[in-house]
């Protein structure tokens, strides 16, 4: 979620099966739908990996990232959103698109991640509200409770003023860019790094 868009109250899907579709978003304070420019860059990065992937959007908000992934033929998406009104709008948008390979979970992301999962994910979006120290905690829970498949790709979007952002040694930095007040990065989780270290 980059800048808050208060004028249109819509999110536009850039490409894929729902290309150029505009969907309503619930106007909440602090909601920052990721801009078209940033999303286009991100999904260029993911172009060879998105089709058939299991996707987890930890802070869904407007659904801009999860819906874009589904439009580009991700196999399944789980979208976590704390605010009930925003979660309900996401469910309505999925119904409008007649999308049946997604779920919206109205829950606190950190609490849900702490419960663990029976099935890992291939692509994870971490785009939390800014200035709340959530990105680092989210990373820790993803690792502790085994949410990531090996070679999973993890997208992290934070405020550019964040002093530091630490990731596990098993996360390889692939891409990093800045757009205005937003810094966004792509990592890949490589479990074999941990296994190799353990045997040395």
PLM region spans:
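Class I S-adenosyl-L-methionine-dependent methyltransferase catalytic core
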Residues: 1-200
